[in-house]
Amino acid sequence: MLSRTADHLFWMSRYTERAENTARILDVNYQTSLLPQSATSAQAGWEGLLSISELKPKFTAKYGENVIPRDVMDFMVRDEKNSSSIVSCLKNARENARAVRGTLTTEVWETENQTHLEVIRMLKSGDFERDPSQFFEWVKFRSHLSRGVTAGTMLQDEAFHFLRLGTFLERADNTARLVDVKFHAAKKELASATDEDFDFYHWSSILRSVSGFEIYRKVYRDVIRPERVAELLILRPDMPRSLLGCLNEVMNNLAMVTSDANSETRRRAGKLRSDLQYAKIDEILANGLHAFLTQFLDRVNELGAHLSREFLVPTTT
């Protein structure tokens, strides 16, 4: 497969996944903002959202130091100058799909194209302002639809596997950022909190942002504990959005696009996966969760760079 074709496929799925992840964290923040809480807690929640995407400097340059929820929502949803906003991600996903339209099935192309057209219509008509949660659910649904149509109609050849690689590298990156920022915020908020309800809503909101609330209940059958939330989102191989689950998918799909045992990309991915496989959550927490996740993000970024050099078009996207 031509590297440029693989590049477009990789970024098509990566941008679609990024739009979904942004919708997830925005929805949870919006729902949490409706609960009784201090102004400081509310402010920290919205600032944390910008930190997850490393967009605080860009936001501050446009809106100033005061973080207002409405401004954050506009910046992360409809700002076309913000490359990580939902509208920008869906536009970029569609443009990458259009570039390789002949490689995709009709159903996949129509899904990407219709999603882009529909999100523009919804933002112009005021649907987002009338019901933000419904809008975020729609974004998540369209991402699910894109993956489902891809799995249900695409030949499982190299094109299919590059699509999957984009999805799971992006998902691993997002989950690591989410856990890092939310657990860091928890140190400040929960250290002074005596309200058990607050404790519950904080951790349950993290789980809901990755569709993990019901999974947690099924796996642990107990009250929500921070160390178990971390274990679920980092080390559980059967959790769809865990770091280990994502790296398993990355390795499986890499194996389908190269049989070269000396591939540096496969070597790095395999080492990162094995480090997660044999890690224990108590050791991670004892050594410092932030340090662990920072190192993980660095290694994922390096993995993406090696993948680009080996298979894709090595440009900054």
Regions found by a protein language model. Give the residues of each.
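Alpha-helical transmembrane segments and their helix-helix packing motifs
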Residues: M1-T317
